[in-house]
Amino acid sequence: MSSGATPAAVKIGIIGGTGLDDPEILEGRTEKYVDTPFGKPSDALVLGKIKNVDCVLLARHGRQHTIMPSKVNYQANIWALKEEGCTHVIVTTACGSLKEEIQPGDIIIIDQFIDRTTRRLQTFYDGNHSCARGVCHIPMAEPFCPKTREVLIETAKKLGLRCHSKGTMITIEGPRFSSRAESIMFQTWGADVINMTTVPEVVLAKEAGICYASIAMATDYDCWKEHEEAVSVDRVLKTLKENANKAKSLLLTTIPQIGSMEWSETLHNMKKMAQFSVLLPRH
């Protein structure tokens, strides 16, 4: 960026997962119901600020948790945040651990994913919307924004949180949990944690040219571990209740830091990548 140029303004979208979508983190909250070319997002957008940084919070499963993972309108959620001017999206997600060293209550700033979903639209460029013409072949070697991840990792260290600085998330279709055979297979594939929502959310954010990062909260050991209680809804909710403040404090401390940083080059590169990944129809 040339000297004297105005730094890029940032606006942070926050997508809250199960038990991690508390709107109280925002100051001066207002609600905004929107529609998109892809339908309605999961719930109202909650607009507000965290230490003077503009933020938009969206409950991934709806505020009453009525939307199962396969039915979340991921296209509408990301499109709505993009249209609201979000430059970044930081999400929270509950997950199961596939590694002994990733304990329930730990935070993982994931850097890779494996997709085991089967029923989800993974692109805006589906041939049905004039707002997204062409075919998009978005690069996915680095799915998550490295710069945003680095801020989250450094902030977690300063807060004294048990945080793993990388991890591969395997996303399953759900809503059922894995069988033991599947859980063990996923370990052999190199997955560290497992959830039901990272894909296609991260893919769509990349298509939208948004800096996307995820705060994953381990709630259980899935079902691979012998002599350990297998994952259940009760166990997930219990661990989230005991540890949700960790994700909350990480968001509240990281977002002002992001707001104070220079993002012009990063945002330019994200938008350029998204733009040049689209093949337009020949005329």
Curated annotation (Swiss-Prot):
Gene3D superfamilies in the record: Nucleoside phosphorylase domain
TM region positions: none
Keywords, comma-separated and alphabetical: Acetylation, Cytoplasm, Glycosyltransferase, Nucleus, Purine salvage, Transferase
Major place of residence: cytoplasm
Cellular component, GO annotation: cytosol; nucleus
Binding site for phosphate: T18, R60, H61, T93, A94, T197
InterPro entries cross-referenced by the UniProt entry: MTAP (IPR010044), Nucleoside_phosphorylase_d (IPR000845), Nucleoside_phosphorylase_sf (IPR035994), Purine_phosphorylase-2_CS (IPR018099)
UniProt subcellular location: Cytoplasm; Nucleus
Residues modified to N6-acetyllysine: K51
Catalysed reaction, written as an equation: S-methyl-5'-thioadenosine + phosphate = 5-(methylsulfanyl)-alpha-D-ribose 1-phosphate + adenine
Positions bound to substrate: M196, D220, Y221, D222
Pathway(s) where this gene product acts: Amino-acid biosynthesis; L-methionine biosynthesis via salvage pathway; S-methyl-5-thio-alpha-D-ribose 1-phosphate from S-methyl-5'-thioadenosine (phosphorylase route): step 1/1
UniProt-recorded Gene Ontology molecular function terms: S-methyl-5-thioadenosine phosphorylase activity
Keyword Acetylation: yes
Entry-linked SUPFAM superfamilies: Purine and uridine phosphorylases
Function (record text): Catalyzes the reversible phosphorylation of S-methyl-5'-thioadenosine (MTA) to adenine and 5-methylthioribose-1-phosphate. Involved in the breakdown of MTA, a major by-product of polyamine biosynthesis. Responsible for the first step in the methionine salvage pathway after MTA has been generated from S-adenosylmethionine. Has broad substrate specificity with 6-aminopurine nucleosides as preferred substrates.
Protein name: S-methyl-5'-thioadenosine phosphorylase
Taxonomic source organism: Bos taurus (Bovine)
Gene designation per UniProt: MTAP
